[in-house]
């Protein structure tokens, strides 16, 4: 099982977005994977992280619940997407939209 780590918003803010999205596209050519990146209810809350790249145990439990479809754990709807070669383009567009909305909200604050 392959998945992307859910980087904290502060780490995501440093990414060269289009390069990162190309990386995700390349992964999808070879295998399906779960993507936990982006700006979502988990990655935008600093409490879920020790610092910008290391998430806390509760986040790990959410990742496992999403991957193994554990209905006993309430996983936020916006956290974790199974990405395939068939849905990668739609997923990348959704990430671009998330990033633009997050950036706009930062400016408006």
Give the predicted meaning of each segment:
Residues 1-32:
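Conserved, well-ordered alpha-helix/loop/beta-strand core segments that scaffold catalytic motifs
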Residues 29-32, 45-46, 79:
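Generic structural motif recognizing short loop/turn segments at the entrances and edges of beta-strands
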Residues 15-26, 53-54, 61, 65, ...:
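Compositional signal for N-terminal targeting/processing segments
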Residues 90-109:
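Charge-patterned, long linear interaction tracts outside catalytic cores
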Residues 26, 66, 94, 98:
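Residues that form generic nucleotide/phosphate-binding pockets
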Residues 20-23, 34-37, 42-43, 48-55, ...:
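C-terminal soluble interaction/assembly domains
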Residues 48-93:
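Histidine-centered active-site loop/cap adjacent to the catalytic His
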Residues 8, 43-45, 84:
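Alpha-helix initiation/capping motif
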